[in-house]
């Protein structure tokens, strides 16, 4: 289960750190029925230099974090007064070299009693609104309990200011340095979502980093001389991450024509090492 | 032989000759012969057929784990690793999680020999063919009346037998290309393609999306669809496709420098008010991209 980002003002909820790190602006689009159950929310992220990956654009884990935040928020708004947790995220990034900013749009496709399905599209405003990525996410509907979910409508959250002290994504997400098939993340409180569990975007960033390291470690010398980057990613959030540390264990399934397929299993080591997320990542030499 | 009376005598799954086996309470395997009728441009099995295979193996596991409840596929993702090295291709599925409302299954697809044994090529096991994952929505028994409620006695081994395919699988559906560059293709919702709900089977939906993506992505690159190899399918099943015809459309994403490109394919049930039934992210590359000298 991944993040919900309730969108509270930053000064009221320091747990908005993850979406603020990418300076994600969000605004609600008018619903078809004009009611208070919106089906579409837009977002924009500037792609700051320290967040770019070897592909030249926003690294895929960062893009997935933004999609998880935007799609989760959109899905949550659509089921108020209930809320959601992400259960699966399927994304394809067809262009890795973005100019930026990237503009995203989330549209609720199906809203059922137990689940919400949302589609997401990404265009590169700096490249003439070129379509660079698409994703579909599924969320489970849940009772928010005592959590207060109040938003001024129509919702708008301005783009946060740039940090005077930028840190790279792996450092921000507390991903420990290393190489090989196992990559570890320290679970610090600022990476938790309003439910107190690890933000789904952090899980995606860990999967990206771990799969890229595993692909490089398993490759012959000379593979990806300019680096590697994730493109197609599928993640099933099976259980919430509560304790940490979090470990991504990768299995390289095969490599063909510059593309490596990696199965990623993420474990919450402090919760009896249980499997929390399983997915696959396609890693490209760039 | 059928699984609880499914599929009918004349059915795509029978013509694909799939054979299934429950290997434990939470695992199963399903295989089909890799024939020219289901081959893609690189000589491997089409991604849409692989998706059909894993949908069947996932459904077999889900039916056993959930009994007496039933299920419907909510999403399916398939990533092709490489072409099939053997005469048969086999999906080996295992349960990842069983929740109150959903069930998640993963499947590894491998090549096997005539006896179902793992292949050995140059002294080692070849790379798998594909990895897949699926989410099933749990349908409590009282809601499952249209789905063919399973009996407590589920078979542990069965085979779908038919006359076999004597023409390419897309022609057997049949797929009609209405507007290739727009990814507008169509299939009828006929019993030959039905699932246990009387709607178009999830694997057939994958085949249509694969074909639509290849048409649109090929046209965007000035290529024929038959020159494109689909490597990834990410499918969200939103509603049953029951009336037909089922018509696709595609939006092409940016194309990478190596010709790798993506498209978002939508399927609508034209006979049901043009209802959106499925959204699929499709990734494809030109077949020439698979130069064996490239690592």
Describe the predicted segments one by one:
Chain B
Residues 1-295:
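Terminal targeting signals and extreme-terminal segments of soluble enzymes
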């Amino acid at each position: 289960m991944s993040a919900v980002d309730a969108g509270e003002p930053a000064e009221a909820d320091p747990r908005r750190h993850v979406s603020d790190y990418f300076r994600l602006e969000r605004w609600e689009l008018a619903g078809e029925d004009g009611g208070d159950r919106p089906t579409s929310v837009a977002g924009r992220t500037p792609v700051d230099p320290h967040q770019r990956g070897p592909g030249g654009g926003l690294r895929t884990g960062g893009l997935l974090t933004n999609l998880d935040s935007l799609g989760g928020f959109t899905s949550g708004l659509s089921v108020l007064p209930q809320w959601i947790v992400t259960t699966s995220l399927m994304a394809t990034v067809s262009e890795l070299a973005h100019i930026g900013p990237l503009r995203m749009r989330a549209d609720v496709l199906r809203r059922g009693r137990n689940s919400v399905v949302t589609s997401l599209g990404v265009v590169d405003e700096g490249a003439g609104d070129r379509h660079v990525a698409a994703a579909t996410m599924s969320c489970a509907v849940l009772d928010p309990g005592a959590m207060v979910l109040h938003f001024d409508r129509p919702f708008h959250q301005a783009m946060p200011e740039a940090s005077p002290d930028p840190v790279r994504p792996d450092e921000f997400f507390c991903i420990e340095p290393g190489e090989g098939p196992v990559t570890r993340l320290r679970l610090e409180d600022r990476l938790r979502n309003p439910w107190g569990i690890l933000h789904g975007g952090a899980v995606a960033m860990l999967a990206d980093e771990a799969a890229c390291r595993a692909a490089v470690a398993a490759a012959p010398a000379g593979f990806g001389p300019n680096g590697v980057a994730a493109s197609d990613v599928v993640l099933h959030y099976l259980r919430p991450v509560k304790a940490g540390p979090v470990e991504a264990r990768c299995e390289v399934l095969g490599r063909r024509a510059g593309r490596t397929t990696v199965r990623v299993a993420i474990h919450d080591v402090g919760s009896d090492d249980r499997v929390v997320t399983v997915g696959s990542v396609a890693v490209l030499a760039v | 032989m059928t699984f609880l009376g499914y599929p009918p005598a004349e059915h795509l799954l029978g013509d694909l000759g799939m054979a299934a086996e429950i290997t434990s309470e939470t695992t199963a395997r399903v295989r089909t012969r890799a024939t020219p009728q289901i081959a893609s441009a690189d000589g491997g099995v089409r991604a849409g057929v692989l998706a059909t295979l894993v949908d069947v193996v996932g459904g077999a596991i889900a039916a056993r784990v959930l009994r007496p409840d039933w299920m419907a596929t909510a999403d399916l993702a398939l990533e092709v690793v490489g072409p099939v090295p053997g005469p048969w291709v086999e999906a080996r599925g295992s349960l990842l999680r069983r929740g109150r409302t959903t069930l998640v299954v993963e499947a590894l697809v491998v090549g096997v020999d005539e006896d179902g044994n793992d292949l050995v090529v140059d002294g080692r096991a070849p790379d798998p063919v594909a990895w897949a994952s699926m989410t099933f929505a749990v349908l409590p028994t009282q809601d499952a009346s249209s789905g063919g409620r399973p009996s407590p006695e589920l078979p542990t081994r069965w085979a779908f037998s038919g006359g076999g395919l004597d023409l390419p699988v897309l022609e057997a559906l049949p797929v009609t290309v209405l507007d290739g560059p727009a990814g507008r293709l169509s299939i009828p919702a006929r019993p030959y393609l039905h699932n246990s709900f009387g709607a178009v089977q999830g694997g057939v939906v994958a085949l249509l999306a694969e074909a639509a993506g290849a048409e649109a992505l090929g046209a965007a690159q000035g290529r024929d669809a038959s020159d494109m190899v689909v490597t990834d399918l990410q499918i969200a099943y939103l509603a049953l496709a029951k009336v037909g015809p089922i018509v696709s459309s595609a939006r092409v994403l940016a194309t990478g420098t190596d010709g790798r490109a993506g498209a978002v394919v939508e399927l609508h049930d034209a006979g049901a008010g043009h209802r959106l039934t499925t959204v699929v992210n499709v990734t494809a590359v030109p077949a020439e991209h698979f130069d064996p000298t490239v690592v």
